[in-house]
Amino acid sequence: MLIDFNEIQEIKIPCMNDGTGMMTVKMYNDENYRIIPTRIHKGGSIGTHTQNSGDDLNYIISGKGKAICNGAEEELKAGVMHICPKGFEHTIIKTGDDDLEMLTIVVAK
C-alpha cells in the first residue's frame, strides 16, 4: 500500500481538543489506523483529552514542545517519540519559536 500525502489536502484546525492556536494537518484514516503529518503553529497546543481510539504515537520531526501524559511531563524535540496509550489522558504544547512538526500515528485497538 502506498499513501501519497502530496495528494491529500492540507487542513487548518483551530484549538484542537479545546487547545490553543492553530495547527495544520493532512489526515489519512482507515479502520486500523490514522496517519497525520501535523504542524502546531505559534501559540498552539492540542488540548487535554483521553485517547479513546487507540495508542497515539507522535514522532517529532522538528521544533520543541512538551507532552503531559497522565500527569507525567515529557520534553519534545526532533528525534523523540511521545506515546500515549489508549485510555490515557494527554496534551501536546508547542514551546519553541518554530512550528512543532510531528508525524502522528493512531493505532486502533
PLM regions and their residue ranges:
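Histidine-centered metal-chelating micro-motifs
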Residues: 45-47, 66, 82, 86-92
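Conserved short histidine dyad/triad with adjacent acidic residue
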Residues: 21, 36-51
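A generic "binding-loop/recognition-motif" signal
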Residues: 33, 42, 53, 72, ...
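Ligand-binding loop in jelly-roll beta-barrel domains
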Residues: 86-109
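Short acidic-glycine-tyrosine-enriched beta hairpin
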Residues: 72-86
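Short, conserved beta-strand element in jelly-roll/cupin
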Residues: 41, 51-67
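A short, N-terminal "cap"/entry segment at the start of jelly-roll beta-barrel domains
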Residues: 1-32
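Short, charged/polar surface micro-motifs in flexible loops or helix N-caps
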Residues: 31-33, 42-44, 64, 108-109
